[in-house]
Amino acid sequence: MLQKIGDDHKFPINKFGEIAKYLINQKVVKNFYNPIACSFKTLNRAHSENYINNIKNKTLDKSGIKKIGFPLVDSVVQRSLIATGGTVLASKLALNYGVACNTAGGSHHANYNEGAGYCVF
């Protein structure tokens, strides 16, 4: 069973769906693409092998989890991998079509060995 963060969590997770709806309603977008999870090889270009494994295996220490701000549960790990995959996909689409964005992107607080501010990768 996929563990999820609760609806009572202070991070506004629904904002990503709302952004997509707004772009559709305003006729800003023509296409949406479904990203796949970012590969270990790609993640390892920006993050340490140890940190990636601690996230994937959910073995990050309590202080690291606290810095991120999310519980380290299956849904957070999957969402983080897919959101990062979305940024990779958006960059490829932008190179092909001139413009693209990741509506679940924008998290930019993680560094090589740790996450922070609701940003895992």
Locate predicted features.
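HDAC/HDAC-like amidohydrolase catalytic core signature
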Residues: M1-F121
